[in-house]
């Protein structure tokens, strides 16, 4: 989901 995508950035 979006959460996983955001965590991928960090």
Curated annotation (Swiss-Prot):
Signal peptide: none annotated. GO terms for cellular component: extracellular region. It is found in: Secreted. The keyword Secreted applies. Keywords: Secreted, Toxin. Expressed by the venom gland. One of its GO terms (molecular function) is toxin activity. This is Toxin To64. It comes from Tityus obscurus.
């Amino acid at each position: 989901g979006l959460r996983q995508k955001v965590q991928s950035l960090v």
